[in-house]
Amino acid sequence: MFFIKIIIDLNIDFMGFFKRFFGGKSESSEDKKEDQSAKDFEVLKYDGVRAMHQGQMDYAIKCLTNALLAKQVDEEGDASKEDQEVLEVRDFLSLALIQKGELAQAYDQLRKLSEAQPDNKQIFVRMAEVTYMMEDYGAMSHACEKGMLIDKDDAHLLFLYAKACLGQGDVINTIAMLTKSILLAEKKQEGLAQAVQSRLLRGETLLKLGDVKGAEEDAAWLLEQLEEPVEEVLLLEARILLAQGKMDDAISYYNKVIDVNPFSAIAFKERGAIYLAKGDKVNAEKDMQSYLEMNPQEADAVTGEFKAEGKEHCR
């Protein structure tokens, strides 16, 4: 037994000798640190994504942010050198930040993604949607233009670009972009939803410009295409009828709006203005009361009368 122990000890020593002789070495503290960072990254990423799916956005943001820290990501560095796992975390983090309303931070993550994947159209679509919520129409235009360099015939990008133009007061380009979006969307069977969005915005814009006939054409198309009543479309038709001086028909469509959404404050407000213009003070007062119940913050500023164009007299 003593002899066997000596042999075992010798084997251990020989192994150590050969390891040193041939350049082998035990795992360094730096290697262990990297292994631990990789494990931390995976755990934090998994926990962050799971928290997102459970609607726990605060915890998701914390986990995903710490996952980037575990990877020792340089936020000021070149994102094009980041690996796919880091980019996936940025993608999830941008979504969580959007859900939380942290739009500027979400935009920063999307900007890093766009640096790493400049040919990914969907990144620019999301950037445009985020900047629209931020009301930063210049940045929104820039994001749309970047996306359209990748695909100039994307109907949704054209729709977003139109909204950016409208936000900057460029009505001519708004109509032009919407018209192009409609033509492209209507060529595709699956493009009906986008065509509806673009037609609705174009109809609303044309009506504001005083082009009642053009707005009516869009509204008629929408009413024909949609199987179920849509509040915004009914509201557009009501306003068109009012602009045409057809008060009773307009009231009929405001009634339909309220049937679809009993809490449509704007429908009560505008219908009340028509009742007042017709001399029906009883119904005008009822609509005004309904409107103020939904907007109690305006009650102190209202005298109780509506102007015919749909605005209440204020003190």
Per-region residue spans from a language model:
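TPR-adjacent "capping" and linker segments in tetratricopeptide-repeat scaffold/adaptor proteins
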Residues: 21-43, 77-85, 187-193
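Conserved structural position within tetratricopeptide repeats
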Residues: 69, 111-115, 145-149, 179-183, ...
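Short coil turns that delineate tetratricopeptide repeat
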Residues: 72, 84, 118, 152, ...
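Alpha-helical segment of the N-proximal tetratricopeptide repeat
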Residues: 34-73, 88, 92-101, 112, ...
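Canonical tetratricopeptide repeat
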Residues: 92, 126, 160, 194, ...
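Start-of-helix register in tetratricopeptide repeats
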Residues: 42, 81, 88, 122, ...
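Register position in tetratricopeptide repeats
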Residues: 53, 99, 133-134, 167-168, ...
